[in-house]
């Protein structure tokens, strides 16, 4: 179990919907500090969060997840002045706009990766940090394809690939930063929006999604925090239909484990075995 008591949490997302509900639950876990970085100011939401736990310090910054990494560094230098350190980084910014592929990829994938790359040095044990946990909030259509929301699905597949790659022991054993992901199923705040399909053939299905059964943002937020508390490095969870399920991960490339051993080995014999296995 990961104990959130006394932790310094940084949440990068819009303070509404899933992010707001997740933050409400976090405020009941006796965290010491909560930094919220979002694209627009939402003072009523901040006030609601503060009313849950007056002793938890809440800090807010307007933040564009698609900004260049150099600009991100300036923001997080300011964040660290107030936060001292970050125990938990939650990436929750998301966009589903099939008519704007660049914005969808930049928000869901590129921006998230730049955020992680910017924050990791502050958390890295070998760089003076205390280790910690990175949580990538993503979607179930990052695990299985969506013929309707193709660009959105592709960006979320990227999040899963990034999460699993960064969770490799090659990094974790050195920097002490665990990485996990929570894949949310259809949730009210998402399906309530007007959504466009990638191709017009799928628009009927996109429209029908607005009437489909879905979980509430409150239940999804609760399960995200539960997944964090149960987390181990590299885990992928599904938060859907009010439940929480641990994903069984598979290696589809039969040489994957041998390739990693080869990359980490200085032994000529091991390298020769890898080359022989490919023939």
Swiss-Prot record:
Any GO molecular function: oxidoreductase activity
GO cellular component: cytoplasm
Keywords tagged on the record: Oxidoreductase
Residues holding substrate: 139
Source taxon at top rank: Eukaryota
Pfam families assigned: adh_short
Alphabetized InterPro entries for the sequence: ADH-rel, NAD(P)-bd_dom_sf, Sc_DH/Rdtase_CS, SDR_fam
Coiled coil: none
Binding site for NAD(+): 11-34
Transmembrane segments: none
Active-site residues, as the UniProt record annotates them: 152 (proton acceptor)
Family recorded in the similarity comment: Belongs to the short-chain dehydrogenases/reductases (SDR) family.
UniProt-recorded name of the protein: Alcohol dehydrogenase-related 31 kDa protein
Naturally occurring in which organism (per UniProt): Drosophila madeirensis
Organism phylogeny: Eukaryota, Metazoa, Ecdysozoa, Arthropoda, Hexapoda
Annotated gene: Adhr
